[in-house]
Amino acid sequence: MSDIALTVSILALVAVVGLFIGNVKFRGVGLGIGGVLFGGIIVGHFVSQAGMTLSSDMLHVIQEFGLILFVYTIGIQVGPGFFASLRVSGLRLNLFAVLIVIIGGLVTAILHKLFDIPLPVVLGIFSGAVTNTPALGAGQQILRDLGTPMAMVDQMGMSYAMAYPFGICGILFTMWMLRVIFRVNVETEAQQHESTRTNGGALIRTINIRVENPNLHNLAIKDVPILNGDKVICSRLKREETLKVPSPETVIQLGDLLHLVGQPADLHNAQLVIGQEVDTSLSTKGTDLRVARVVVTNENVLGKRIRDLHFKERYDVVISRLNRAGVELVASSDISLQFGDILNLVGRPSAIDAVANVLGNAQQKLQQVQMLPVFIGIGLGVLLGSIPVFVPGFPAALKLGLAGGPLIMALILGRIGSIGKLYWFMPPSANLALRELGIVLFLSVVGLKSGGDFIHTLVDGEGLSWIGYGALITAVPLITVGILARMLAKMNYLTMCGMLAGSMTDPPALAFANNLHPTSGAAALSYATVYPLVMFLRIITPQLLAVLFWSIG
């Protein structure tokens, strides 16, 4: 068998063994995709014992390409929400998550200086302790750029594997410990979250209001500031028994019922100006109006602002809200449409059908992947990651590398959405498939390279010490920030658990947090809020640590 055939066969075996290990769960928690790393270590041990020779060049290419696929698809997935998560709505959660990253870096630096841990080893421990595989790839990339021998670079994968198991268990232990320390009643926390969940004003709500302010009588909607802005949408108006779709020129009268869509704070302001909330239904049932959800798939409308499409003037149809990448938004007239946006339309059936034709609404297109934008994005990301930045006093030029470059480019392209007829939307199933393929390839090679000396290092070497160092890097930031968030910020326990899981970019921890109260979405919401920024910082941090440690010796 040729070296290439043998290498591919061994990688396939690693994937099978690793995915099987990852699917084994104890009380609902398993290693997940991290099991591939340990599958690689097991197979790598026996490959080394058997004296087999694999193609090192091929393994290197597969490892790097897998990493590129993984970080690129992550960037495309979180891009639409990345910059939004930096705004005020998620500022507090993101600040606590960033603090966890910073404390983890400080603990790593202290351990490195106190115990004289080799640079590749301490970076591997750091990456494993925070269960972040892209951080491992980014660290290995910068070490190679700094001229570190390959044998030393491979040690990073081994120390990563030592620290990884407690990285998963440590966050679960932290959640349990904080629950005991603060005597948390999970049911009470869930009820409190449900009663106050505004996510900084990010959730979209509807309200029916009766016009009671005499100053508004016989005014057109466009002349009422609270209704003429982009924060509140009036999608229906009921006068006596007639339900209609209002336009900016529609004149409102005392006693009219308005169906408003917006964020809770904005709806409250509208209520103060217009009148009291009423329980009267403004349902379209039994009327000549209906509500429909339509998907944007027509390339001709991509990048166009809602106001420029003139749906209200041409078709008497109102867009009441917009869903982008799972996030509900008020359909502001200044919003530019992106491929895959889901619009809530209110209007007559024939008019809605006409608008749907303009927008596309071709469900089959959502399952298709445009491969040209994928490779354009990957290519641009690799180029971005290869740009050297020379800083006086540093031994090597700083680069984003094959982990940082594709990630940042994907974040930017995911946020832009489309350029002309090129759109970077990727169906969730396709995104997940490419992401899983990439991480399986990457971890398979890392495990194979680490497997030969893993047992020896664990039993006869410094493996146990590495596990201890990793436990400190995992536990100290989580416990510290968890206590601060609960005591100082009075953060909801379920929200805090999601934030802790997101700060470690750890899906098994999110699964555990979700199971604390299966019907509450608090943990998932906070996890999604901090995940994009933290993923970016986790990839950049080992590179900064590597250059810092290298420069100060």
Swiss-Prot record:
SUPFAM superfamilies on file: TrkA C-terminal domain-like
Alphabetical UniProt keywords: Cell membrane, Membrane, Repeat, Transmembrane, Transmembrane helix, Transport
Topology versus the membrane: Multi-pass membrane protein
Molecular function terms, GO-annotated: monoatomic cation transmembrane transporter activity
Taxonomy, superkingdom: Bacteria
Transmembrane segments: 4-24, 28-48, 65-85, 95-115, 158-178, 371-391, 393-413, 439-459, 464-484, 493-513, 533-553
Domain RCK C-terminal: 191-276, 279-361
GO cellular component terms listed in the entry, alphabetical order: plasma membrane
Biological process annotations from GO: potassium ion transport
Family matches, as PROSITE patterns: RCK_C (PS51202)
Location relative to the cell: Cell membrane
InterPro entries: AAE_transporter (IPR050144), RCK_C (IPR006037), RCK_C_sf (IPR036721), Transpt_YidE_put (IPR023018), YidE_YbjL (IPR006512)
Principal location: membrane
Family, similarity comment: Belongs to the AAE transporter (TC 2.A.81) family. YidE subfamily.
Name the UniProt record assigns to this protein: Putative transport protein YidE
The organism of origin for this protein: Escherichia coli O1:K1 / APEC
